[in-house]
């Protein structure tokens, strides 16, 4: 499996793990109760929000506007029953999509560079900040939740280093 496909697969796995309905079935095996206690502030006062707006200085509307521009630029639309556009699972799923786009254009330098610029911009402007906020704000001592957040934090930091290196090349 090529590198972009591996990266895409990791993003997909992490996106599913941060989704309430799929968290228990994934490799981290987080129960619904533990998920709510760790990540749903509407149900647990000590929970860490998985929404970017909780970890950013900008107001919600400007965050949403920029996120929707990213998604729509690549032809993606939000289903009205979907998570909010600033939810960690949605942002990870978008990076799954962007990394998946690398393979078909691997032999087209301009298109590949454009996709990699989008990855760089999205990671540095949105996903990196969100993951850092969740990592710093997690209060749960549940081992599966801790492992999920640590794994995501480490992976995103590796990805940030990769996209910065590629941007300088």
Label each residue range with its predicted role.
Residues 1-169:
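Surface/interface-facing alpha-helical segments and adjacent flexible terminal/loop regions used
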């Amino acid at each position: 499996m090529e590198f972009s496909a591996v990266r895409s697969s990791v993003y997909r796995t992490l996106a599913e793990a941060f989704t309430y309905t799929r968290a228990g079935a994934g490799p981290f095996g987080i129960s619904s109760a533990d998920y709510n206690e760790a990540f749903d502030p509407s149900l647990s006062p000590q929970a860490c929000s998985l929404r970017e707006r909780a970890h950013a200085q900008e107001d919600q509307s400007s965050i949403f506007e920029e996120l929707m521009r990213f998604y729509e630029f690549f032809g993606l639309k939000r289903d009205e029953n979907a998570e909010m556009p600033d939810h960690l699972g949605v942002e990870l799923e978008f990076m799954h999509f962007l990394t998946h786009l690398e393979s078909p254009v691997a032999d087209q330098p301009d298109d590949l560079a454009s996709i990699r610029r989008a990855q760089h911009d999205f990671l540095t402007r949105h996903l990196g900040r969100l993951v850092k906020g969740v990592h710093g704000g997690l209060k749960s001592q549940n081992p599966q939740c801790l492992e999920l957040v640590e794994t995501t934090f480490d992976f995103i930091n590796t990805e940030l280093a990769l996209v910065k290196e590629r941007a300088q090349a």
